[in-house]
């Protein structure tokens, strides 16, 4: 029987498969599903739009573009997600408004060691270009790139993930903000917003807690 553990609930296990938001005993390719169900309610996977989801656990960053489905009901972290045959394929992890991610083997992904480096997430505004850690109109960015080209590159200190309606990018910069590396994903996506976790405190008491988008790193 497949088991899934939410990182937001302390379920990270380095001995299991790890995907954004979950550790699991199986590695499900969630790109193949067009319909999923939660508590016997069916939901269609959104076409040509994705959610960039990520966990930060034990100084490890696990990020990926994941499929998502629309649901007007409130679904809680850890709720089981099944395929049309009734097999559990994932659990609820991240959401953006009325959209919920389907975590597992997704599309483009990023797995990093965060020892000595930071990572930052941004919404890429429509019409803007990117250089390193800044976004602006194309002409401004072109001048910025020209200016920074005179500097010698240094070690990477920060990664920046840019999520836009039509394209997503990852850049890496040195201490001066010079761009050292760039990746482009030709897919439009959204960033998740914090979900709510209902935690049982006592025999008859519950409290709603706002979870972080990903599990807090170990200290």
UniProtKB/Swiss-Prot annotation:
Transmembrane segments: none annotated. The keyword Nuclease applies. Keywords: Early protein, Hydrolase, Nuclease. It is an enzyme of class 3 (hydrolase). GO terms for molecular function: 2',3'-cyclic GMP-AMP binding; nuclease activity. It comes from the Viruses. The record marks 60, 105, 169, 182, 184, 186 as: Substrate binding. It catalyses: 2',3'-cGAMP + H2O = Gp(2'-5')Ap(3') + H(+). HAMAP family: Poxins (MF_04143). The substrate binding site is formed by the N-terminus of a monomer and the C-terminus of the opposite monomer. Nuclease that is responsible for viral evasion of host cGAS-STING innate immunity. Cleaves 2',3'-cGAMP which is produced by host cGAS following recognition of cytosolic DNA and blocks the subsequent 2',3'-cGAMP-mediated activation of TMEM173/STING, which normally spreads to adjacent cells and activates the interferon and NF-kappa-B immune responses. The sequence shown comes from the strain chorioallantois vaccinia virus Ankara (CVA), which is the ancestor strain of the modified vaccinia virus Ankara (MVA). Homodimer. This is Poxin. It comes from Vaccinia virus (strain Ankara). The gene is OPG188.
